[in-house]
Amino acid sequence: YQMDFWLDEGGAFLNCRMRVVNHNPDVTPMYWWSNMAVPEYEGGRVIVPAESAYSSGGGSVYKVPVPVVDGIDISYYQNIPGQVDYFFNIPEEAPRYIANVAPDGYGLLQYSTRRLRGRKLFTWGNNSASARWQEYLTEEAGRYVEIQAGLGKTQYGCIPMAPHTAWEWLGRYGAVTLSGRSDSFEEEREGLTAMVRDEAGETLEKTLRDSHGWAMKPGKVVYRGSGYADLENACRVRRGEEPLSPHLD
C-alpha cells in the first residue's frame, strides 16, 4: 500500500491519498478502515448521511434505524449505555462523510471519494467499565469515541480484490463549524450533506485522478524499513513475476 499526504495552498483540510495493490495472480481478501479517535464532547453528536446501520449482539448481525435505536438517539453518543459498533448504511448516491460535532457546531469532518464507502461509530458506552477502559487507553487524553471510514460497509468481512488490481481513493480531514444547529438529526444530516456536496462535488474525484501521475513517481527516501520487500522482489523476479511497485524504494 502507499499513502500520500498534503495540504493545499490556503486549504483547511488534510488530503490523504491511498493506494492498495494486489500484485498477485490470485484474488485476495481486502480490508481497510481509517480510524479517527475524536473527543467525546459533552452533548456531542455524530452526523452521517444514513437512515440505517448494521450492528451486532447475541451472536447475530442486524439492521437498525438511524438515529433512534430502541428509543435512544444514538447520534448523541453519550446516550449509548454500553460498548457498541454502528456501521452506517450510506446510500450509493450519497456523499461519503462522517462528522463529530460539539453543541456549538465545531468538530471534525472527514469525507472522501466514493470507493471509501463505509462509515462507523464506535463507543465504549457510559458505565464504570467503559470509563476504566478509556482511562487505561488514553491516560490523560480524556474520553473519546471512534469514527471510521472503510472500503466495506462493515468490518464483518473482507472484499474480494481481483488479481493485478490497484484501488485508489482520496480522503480529507479538517475542522468544521455548523451554524443553525437543530435537535433534528434529519435536518442536521441534510444541512451537512449539502455542505459536503458544495465542498467536494466531483472535484474530489478529479483531484484523485489528477494526482495519479505524481503519486506514481519515485520519491526521496527519508527512512528505510526492513529488507523484506527486497527479498519479496527477488523471489518474484525468480518466479518470472513483476516486482512490487517499482516507483517505491
Feature locations, PLM:
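Catalytic micro-motifs at enzyme active sites that drive phosphoryl/nucleotidyl and oxygen chemistry
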Residues: 2-7, 156-158
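Short, well-ordered beta-strand segments enriched in hydrophobic/aromatic residues
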Residues: 3-5, 14-22, 171
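Non-catalytic surface loops within mature trypsin-like serine protease
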Residues: 9, 22, 175-177
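A contiguous, surface-exposed recognition patch within enzymatic or periplasmic domains that forms
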Residues: 12, 23-165, 219-221, 226-227, ...
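Short Pro-Gly-centered flexible turn/kink motifs
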Residues: 18, 160-177
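Charged, amphipathic alpha-helical linkers/stalks
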Residues: 169-243
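Amphipathic alpha-helical repeat scaffolds of TPR domains
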Residues: 248-249
